[in-house]
Amino acid sequence: MANRGARHARTEDSDNTINYVQCDGLAVMKMVKHCHEESSNMDLAQGALLGLVVDKCLEITNCFPFPKSGDETMDEEMYQLTVMRRLRRVNVDHLHVGWYQSSDVGNSLSLALLESQYHYQTSIEESVVVVYDTQKSSRGFLCLKAYRLTPQAIQMYKDGDFTPEAFRTLKVGYESLFAEIPIVIKNSPLTNIMMSELNELLPEDKGHNFLDLGTASVLENHMRSLIERVDELYQEAVRYNKYQQVVFKQDTEKHRALAKLAAENAVRTSKGEPTVPEEEVIKQFRPMPVPARLTATITSGQINTHAQHIAQFCSQSLAKLFITESLQNAKETKEIK
């Protein structure tokens, strides 16, 4: 996981609050290249972010990928230390400031992401996780987002209490597990000049495909993932309902046993015999362990994300459908005349 090597990182003596993330173009290109290469193999791309903190800005100046977990001969910790040591020799920022990973069908929220960012953020206070959406970026929309765990989520994870009472006490929901940090991309003046020159050499877009709906794969993937997440949430709800039924049955039996004991103690008191303490009955009914609700909370967040993506995609497709219908009607009217 991405928390491998977090304990070897160093922290900066600066404010823990990060207002925004500034990422160099070189680091962005390396992340994009790595994520797209791994997406072809259906693997999750992960890597380390290097940089420094200036005031309340986290500057990401470089990055490198983590070795694949399937390579048993690779010492992952030694690999990361060697890379950072060599970067230091060539005067490149080598301080560990977080990690990055690719996202699956536009949805990055997961238990593994939460655990990894918790280990990072407790070891490197200013660390962030940068998530790159390969599918959305492949359609021409660069999707690069930075996240940090909220203080409530960190406190909940430290306590290790994921019961419904803990969620209510800390006021934690799927929408308050992570806080999105604004991210900006910065290039050097020479790079900006080169990009301007390249832009002039590119052919003009004639706009032939602006009405392309492209609903086949995108909507299908989101719907499939949404159905899977809904099934998982249903199973979590079934397990929690069974727990509540068992607790209700146990409480009913305990109250019945206590009432019976109270009647027996009243008879013993009338006869002058010693009464039996209620603790003897209570010991027979051990409290049931409360099932953790963290998985259900994360699944709810994934469902919400998929629903938002589907709603956004459908609204854009409906607009294109209305435009296409108008063009088709205009064409038919022209042919009739």
Curated annotation (Swiss-Prot):
The gene is eIF-3p40. PROSITE patterns: MPN. The keyword Heme does not apply. Belongs to the eIF-3 subunit H family. Keywords: Cytoplasm, Initiation factor, Protein biosynthesis. It is found in: Cytoplasm. Component of the eukaryotic translation initiation factor 3 (eIF-3) complex. The eIF-3 complex interacts with pix. Interacts with mxt. InterPro entries: eIF3h, eIF3h_C, JAMM/MPN+_dom, JAMM_MPN+_peptidase_M67A, MPN. It holds the Pfam family eIF3h_C. It comes from Drosophila virilis (Fruit fly). One of its GO terms (biological process) is formation of cytoplasmic translation initiation complex. Component of the eukaryotic translation initiation factor 3 (eIF-3) complex, which is involved in protein synthesis of a specialized repertoire of mRNAs and, together with other initiation factors, stimulates binding of mRNA and methionyl-tRNAi to the 40S ribosome. The eIF-3 complex specifically targets and initiates translation of a subset of mRNAs involved in cell proliferation. This is Eukaryotic translation initiation factor 3 subunit H. HAMAP family: eIF3h. One of its GO terms (molecular function) is metallopeptidase activity. One of its GO terms (cellular component) is eukaryotic 48S preinitiation complex. Residues 21-153 form the MPN domain.
